[in-house]
A protein has these predicted regions:
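Canonical Radical SAM [4Fe-4S] cluster-binding loop centered on the CxxxCxxC motif
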Residues: 2-38
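Conserved, mostly hydrophobic/aromatic
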Residues: 17, 116, 234
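Radical SAM/AdoMet-radical enzyme domain recognition
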Residues: 39-60, 68-183
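Acidic beta-to-alpha connecting loop that harbors the catalytic carboxylate
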Residues: 63
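Hydrophobic, well-ordered secondary-structure segments
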Residues: 108, 168, 198-218
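Short, charged, surface-exposed secondary-structure boundary motifs
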Residues: 124-128, 190, 248
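Flexible glycine/acidic-rich beta-alpha junction loops that bind and position SAM and/or redox cofactors
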Residues: 178-197, 211-221, 246
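Accessory C-terminal segments flanking Radical SAM cores
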Residues: 207-277
Length: 277
């Protein structure tokens, strides 16, 4: 049963990170209109019809979601009853450059988890993420001032992080929060084996997101075609890494239409990487 979706509410970003694999998918990513309210209606219908205890929505995808903050606010307010009741758990991941007190207090009020992308130490982060380390650290401190704790953090793991593994782990140990390490894919990608070796090392001292049927990019098993789908460009895809492949359908289709997907592959490996070998 579908109980988790990701919605790419826009296809634009205020950064041009060197390793972003969406650069390689640019011809498949467009600004086609998508009725997010219809998607949310379909989610609410499925929650009520199937008595789903918690439905997870990630407002994440091909760009920086806070570039469309006013629309994002409307989406959050539209499902606020379900957020307040805990029936929907919503989150987003941001580069932090647009964080301010008003935005962070709004998301805190409506129980939307804010994750921030930071690639560890200044040298590595600035190499790939447009020399923004100091600004991201300021955003992290602002979040802590408002929420009384540090935000969850996302670190993309490429060769530079591997080369500075001990320094990276030491950097994140200062925050005492949950860290998602994401395997770099595409042109600058690293192998699954190298990534998993790093995860094992990091997990010995950090609270690292791992395990379960989720995504091999985050250290779990590939959950493509099981209980989650990805919305972008007015379409539905098996996952966010597959927006340059044939869509499963259009974004206005009910969730029930995607319930009977069946894919036979080794889920220790990424679905797309498996079929593209």
């Amino acid at each position: 049963m579908i109980d988790r979706i990701c919605i790419s509410i826009n296809n634009r970003c205020n950064m041009a990170c060197k390793y972003c694999h969406f650069h390689e998918k640019a011809s498949s990513i467009c600004g086609q209109d998508m009725d997010v309210f219809k998607i949310l209606d379909n989610v609410v219908y499925s929650i009520e019809k199937n008595n789903i205890h918690v439905f997870k929505i990630g407002f994440v995808g091909n760009g920086e979601p806070l570039l469309d903050y006013e629309k994002f606010k409307e989406y959050v307010l539209y499902i606020s009853k379900y957020l307040d009741d805990g029936r929907i758990a919503a989150y987003t991941i941001s580069n932090g450059l647009l964080w301010d007190r008003e935005k962070l207090e709004f998301f805190k009020l409506h129980r939307v988890n804010m994750g921030i992308s930071i690639d560890g130490i200044e040298e590595v982060h600035n190499e790939y993420r447009c020399n923004t380390h100091s600004r991201v650290m300021e955003a992290i401190q602002l979040y802590k001032d408002i929420n009384g704790k540090y935000p969850s953090m996302n670190c993309t793991v490429g060769e530079s992080v591997i080369e500075h593994a001990d320094e990276t782990i030491a950097f994140f140990s200062e925050f005492e929060n949950r860290i998602t390490f994401s395997r770099m894919i595409g042109k600058y990608g690293i192998s699954l084996g190298v990534f998993n070796d790093f995860l094992r090392k990091a997990s010995s001292s950090l609270n690292v997101r791992t395990g379960g049927y989720d995504c091999t990019m985050y250290g779990g098993m590939c959950g493509a075609g099981m209980n989650n789908i990805f919305y972008s460009n007015g379409n539905v895809y098996i996952c966010g890494n597959c927006v340059d492949m044939e869509p499963l359908g259009t974004s206005d289709m009910p969730l029930a239409d995607f319930e009977n997907l069946s894919y036979d592959f080794d889920r220790k490996h990424c679905y797309k990487e498996t079929i593209c070998e």
